[in-house]
Amino acid sequence: MSSSSALQPVIPAKPLCTPDGKVSHDTSSGTLAIKRAFQAKGILLADGFLSADGSLLADGSLLADGSPAAQSVDTVPVINEKDIAHRFSKAANQYNSIASIQRVIAEQALANLPHRLQGQALDIGCGTGIHTQALYRKGAAATGVDIAEGMLAFARKKYSDPIFIQGSVLDLPFTENTFSTVFSSMALQWVSDTGLAAKQIARVLKKGGVAELAIMVAGSFDELKTARKVAQLAQADMVMPTAAQWGYSFKQSGLSLQRVITKDYVDMHSDIMSLLRSVKGVGAGATGRKQPPLNRRDIKKLAMAYFNASGVESKLPLTYRVSHFRLEKR
């Protein structure tokens, strides 16, 4: 971890239930606030998260019947897989040194799995293979799949035991009912079709198999979006599906939702360039439309707006909102 950044996983505090069924979480000394509205059926766990049969009403992203609310055309992500593959391939050699917050999130997701695994395990969006190797150490016959050949070349060179294959989650190159475990951490936010991705995961899972998925969702990078707005800069194209949209897609695929927990992980940076490099270095924002580069004046305006809005002295927070899904194929 570089000296310019520090990690702070932020877990929502004890929830407060309002009379209309809303649950409010206050985090990070009031500088960040998470608000989620739930259908008032009493299907709330003690920690404020939904039980498996709950219907989420997250800022209108799901209607009362559990179906997704309509999105306007300009809020639908435009994903270019070739662009994403190219960006991640370029980042392969430096990815492990930059992606410190990704490691924290993946370690949490791996900790959610049993200590020992049996059968075959798939790591979707395996990147440099570090987490595929962790699945292998848990006892699984591990396979990593990624769209970025540069990442796979790095993984094959470093790890000899897992198998690494190029492929997309939208068209997984495996037969039905192959894997007892499917794992993915910080990769599925780049998906353009959550429904198709969910169906592919369900297809390759064996009956009784489990998927443990950590997915960055809408609400991530809000500080950066706010600072860009205050600085009157064009918004970067970083639209992500909501946790509710993913939940609906998994339900439609036939997978059983066992648990979903959404956490804010906050990466602290000492300056704006460190923050922007961390976003670019891990391939974030590779969603299709090109953005004009920031000039020196833009960067100065952005830094000033960020410091004024962050409320954290001498540090710039960047929030990764991640939903940890546990799914089962019955």
Model-predicted regions and their roles:
Residues 259-330:
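Conserved Class I S-adenosyl-L-methionine
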